[in-house]
Amino acid sequence: VEYNGGITRSYPINSAWLAGVDYFLHDQSYNNTLNLKLLYKKIIQADSKVPMQFTGVWTCKDLFGLKGLTFDGFADVWFEDHSCNIGVNEDGTNVTKTKHTVFITEPQLWYNVGRHFGCNNLNVGTEIELSNNFGTTLGFKCRPCLGVKWNF
């Protein structure tokens, strides 16, 4: 069972309850994992012709045999009638278009630089958000970023 919801400055996230099946794959060391989910999704205050969500979550540690290099992330696709902004009227109101299919993935690549000087919690890396009709954004977007991460 899972709950999704919240609000941000830019757009609301419709509250939703999810339940379903989960399939977990891994290698012998658990350094490489893949989690696949097929979920029934009940979205509060929104319509969905197909009340489902597909989710994949992965982790690959020591990628390409390089100690400290990790590739991980998730991908979600679901179906929800929601409004995406396509412009602004002269009076300042948003012009919207209703879309139904939503996709988002956020693959991350991290390297543990701290392992070279006794600070194993310190990582540098990147995340790239790839999305289609997510939030109020119409169409495909690519949003890369760089980061420093401290593992607790």
Regions found by a protein language model. Name each.
Residues 3-9, 25, 38-44, 60, ...:
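Transmembrane beta-strands of outer-membrane beta-barrel pores
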Residues 11-19, 32, 48-54, 100-105, ...:
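Residues that define the transmembrane beta-barrel architecture of outer-membrane proteins
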Residues 1, 24-34, 61-71, 113-124:
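Short loop/turn motifs that connect adjacent beta-strands in outer-membrane beta-barrel proteins
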Residues 43, 48-78:
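A contiguous pocket-lining binding segment that forms or flanks enzyme active sites
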Residues 19-25, 38-40, 54-60, 107-113, ...:
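Residues on the lipid-exposed face of transmembrane beta-strands in outer-membrane beta-barrel proteins
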Residues 107-152:
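Predominantly the C-terminal beta-signal and adjacent terminal strand-loop region
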Residues 47-49, 83-96, 135-144:
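Outer-membrane beta-barrel translocator domains and adjoining extracellular loop/strand segments
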